[in-house]
Amino acid sequence: MVNQMRSAIVKVFSTKHSLTLPAPALHYIEEVLIENEIPEDEWMVGLEFWAKEYLKAEDSSSLVSLQALKKAYENLQLGTTEDTQVADPSEVNVESHFSVVDSFDMPAMRYDPVRSGFVQSKAQPSVAGQASSRSAFLRERWAIIKEIILRNENFTPPAIGGHDRANYLKLTSIRNLLGRAGQLFLLFGMLARNEEGKLCLEDGESRVVLDMEDAVPGEGLFTEGCMVLIEGEYTVEETVRVLAMGHPPSERRNIARSLHGHVDFLGGGAVSLKEEQKYNPTVLANTQISFVILSDVWLDHPRTMPALRQMFEGYANTAEYRPMVFVLCGNFCQGGWEGQEGLKRYSRGFNSLAELLQSIPLLHSSHFVFVPGPSDPWSSTTLPRPSLPSAFTTRLSNRIPNARFVSNPCRLKYFGMEIVICREDLMGKMMRNLVVVKEGEEMNMKRYLVQTILDQAHLSPLPISVRPTLWEYDHALRLYPMPSAVVLADKYERYELTYEGCHVFNPGKFVGGIGEDGWEFEWSMYYPATGRSERSVLTME
């Protein structure tokens, strides 16, 4: 009987659908047929349904994986095949599709240039980090962006014999420049400094010194650590005379998701594009759902608590439009936490906030997410940085069940959407470390910053000497696939704009200062249904 069963499995999966079944997958199919006591005359029909369900999945391949096979079987059991109609918004529990992701809980997905895909690291990331990982994370960042470039239509070779075959853009590696002085090349690599302090370009294989005298930069901010495209002439001095410099092209979220939709970047299970489309009507129907984002919530400022009370009570009294989540970003103390008095002041601030939130029961159904700022304890200089110490937060956590103290950065997952929250004074750091920037009347530094971050697909495209990062947690700073939205909470003035489908905004400082009508407090509200944010202002005498 076993031989007949195996023959039927091979006939359907291998002969008919040209699928290769490894031993574990074959044994699993046999176990399912035996455990469910499927009659022999129903084997072929059941196996046919199973094979077709497997082939519908986005991560299906000719070599059948046990995980994908199990998922196809579960879909058949639940009746949730890819042909299932869209979900009824009134029947979907929105809360079950919302989660907060800490950077230190994200799976360590590493890019494999051979497979042109992501695989989960077998080793657990370490905060200390091995010496080998210091160079590995830069090579990985370079490889990811290079793959994006080569997929771009301007770099894709036309069909053989096509009229434009000679005109498409071609990258040249730095080591292939030798002996070709006087010729023009298009190079891709990372801006860095050599031992003599000269600006150079590195591509993982070699490096070359750059002559920037005639360089014309494109839009964006160019600093050391950025991956850039350079058009220039190789000279007899073995340098490149740069004619033009630009950021690499970005890749929209839907394109990246179509390629890597089966990869679980955030943990908690991957959401396929078809699953995302299934719940799109639910996201669009819930126009009342919002995320409130505040930054620099100085709990030691005398006017902060009254302003927070008025804001929270205002939201609590509008049940239909009560925010789903409040994200409070640091710094949480204007005067600093150092010293005995500073620690007491910091503790008093969070204790007062705990009492305030407990006094408004209507808000207890909302989530509260706390993201540390650069000056919060214990003043970690690296990204990602851990959550606030429990010594200050235990009282609030005990009183407010939905309070989460997470890393900086962190991410919000809402159905198939991903919202990145990062508290970092990034504009100032980028401006202080500029190598070159395009000048002119239309110069827009806010747009340049957003374009740079998304084109670089990274929250910190700076050298680790300027902005230290945890090498083995670099995946937590990655912006690939491009998120649905990015909150760049910065002490710089607020802004909001959309680039390549990704909405990026800075809510500004909560305590805005004195205006014409009194003290002003500002924050941002993000609406997942529209994918846009808006400014909110509270004025108090």
From Swiss-Prot:
The gene is DPB2. GO terms for cellular component: chromatin; epsilon DNA polymerase complex. Pfam families: DNA_pol_E_B (PF04042). As accessory component of the DNA polymerase epsilon (DNA polymerase II) participates in chromosomal DNA replication. This is DNA polymerase epsilon subunit B. Disulfide bonds: none annotated. Transmembrane segments: none annotated. GO terms for molecular function: DNA binding. Coiled coil: none annotated. Keywords: DNA replication, DNA-binding, Nucleus. Heterotetramer. Consists of four subunits: POL2, DPB2, DPB3 and DPB4. In eukaryotes there are five DNA polymerases: alpha, beta, gamma, delta, and epsilon which are responsible for different reactions of DNA synthesis. It is found in: Nucleus. One of its GO terms (biological process) is CMG complex assembly. The keyword Nucleus applies. Belongs to the DNA polymerase epsilon subunit B family. Its main location: nucleus. The keyword Nucleus applies.
